[in-house]
Design a protein with these regions (language model features):
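Membrane-embedded helix bundles of polyisoprenyl
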Residues: 36-40, 130-148, 153-218, 222-260, ...
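Short loop/turn hinge sites at secondary-structure boundaries
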Residues: 70, 76-77, 92, 201, ...
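Alpha-helical transmembrane segments and their immediate interhelical/interface regions
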Residues: 1-28, 236, 242-245, 249, ...
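Start-transfer (signal-anchor) and selected internal transmembrane alpha helices
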Residues: 1-51, 61, 137, 142, ...
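Membrane-interfacial, low-structure loops and terminal tails that flank and connect transmembrane helices
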Residues: 1-27, 202-225, 229, 265-274, ...
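Transmembrane helical bundles and short interhelical boundary loops of multi-pass, membrane-embedded
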Residues: 56-60, 265-318
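Active-site lumenal/periplasmic loops and adjacent helix-entry segments of GT-C-fold
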Residues: 44-189, 200, 207, 242
């Protein structure tokens, strides 16, 4: 056990444990944490404005339907309100177009941290700061994506720019804007990172069809694990926002181009096809959970579109 800990320590810090060497290896961690702390503090500056004697208030219209969804989930967890009569009143609106995972996560956190008995003031406070939390959390996968292609220094520079930029991302992640937009950014970025990692592992370990036929799970363990993770990440994105099915479309286009490129250059396309088949199977199966209509509807509702599109990628991967 001690040898394993020592090996792990050396993998992180290296055999050269001088102060300069250690700083070079881990400097990005405190810098990234400082940037995240700055972003979070900047987004919470006006918190007191949204806390009144009559409860909490929100900025804009959209946060109110999530307020109703989360309030319903607090009383009926994990169920969410299937229909929102107040949006587009008096006709109402099918609430699933907003996504429900965001409300379930926030409601679950409120219930967990209040031991199942939250006060209205505490529940309102968590809703007020939920968007800043998700916005700052999105920095982590964004950093790893940038570091994967450009290195740690440029990745930190990019996060620094993001921390200072005004615009849509800032507006959607400010305190008081209790909307699913911040969760969209987080889960989409997480999904992209998960696919990058899965493809990297597959290209390194080369899972081919013979290994599947031989049931060599030792050789398939890492590619299978990370491919399942990529599928789960894509599924979570669509649970948070049904039009997130666009991510499946984009990855499908990438897989088609990448598979063609591998064949053209004389490389085996099987590792890429393995990631596509496993991840899209997981995503497609996850979409059966919120499925509400057995027809191919629009992207704003959970329909067979969210099921068939990822499952269709499996057939493309096998061609």
């Amino acid at each position: 056990m001690q040898d394993a800990v020592t090996d792990r320590f050396e993998n992180i810090f290296g055999s050269d444990r001088s102060l300069t060497s250690v700083v070079k290896r881990v400097y990005h961690i405190p810098v990234l944490l400082a940037l995240m702390a700055f972003m979070f503090a900047a987004r919470l500056r006006r918190l007191d404005v949204f806390q009144t004697g009559d409860g909490v208030t929100f900025r804009g219209n959209d946060p109110w339907y999530h307020f109703r969804q989360t309030s319903y989930a607090l009383d009926h967890f994990p169920s969410t309100m299937p229909f929102d009569p107040m949006t587009n009143y008096p006709m109402g609106t099918n609430a699933e177009q907003f996504g429900t995972l965001y409300d379930q996560l926030v409601a679950g956190f409120i219930l967990l941290t209040s031991f199942g008995d939250p006060t209205p003031e505490y529940a309102g406070l968590i809703m007020l700061i939920a968007a800043p939390v998700f916005g700052v959390a999105a920095v982590v996968p964004a950093y790893f994506i940038a570091a994967r292609f450009a290195g740690r220094g440029p990745a930190l520079a990019g996060i620094s720019v993001l921390a200072l930029l005004p615009g849509t991302f800032l507006n959607y992640t400010l305190v008081g804007f209790y909307d699913h937009s911040a969760a969209e950014v987080f889960f989409q970025t997480l999904g992209v990172l998960a696919f990058i990692v899965a493809l990297t592992v597959a290209e390194r370990e080369q899972p081919v069809w013979e290994l599947v036929v031989d049931r060599d799970f030792n050789a398939l363990r890492n590619p299978l694990t990370y491919s399942i993770g990529a599928g789960i990440a894509a599924g979570l994105y669509m649970w948070a926002w049904p039009p997130g099915v666009l991510l499946v479309g984009f990855t499908g286009v990438f897989f088609a181009i990448k598979l063609t490129s591998e064949v053209y250059h004389g490389n085996s396309p099987e590792p890429i096809a393995f990631v596509a088949a496993v991840s899209m199977t997981v995503t497609g199966l996850m979409m059966f959970v919120p499925l509400s209509t057995f027809s191919i509807g629009g992207s704003t509702d959970y329909s067979l579109l969210q099921v068939l599109l990822p499952l269709g990628e499996i057939g493309r991967a096998h061609v």
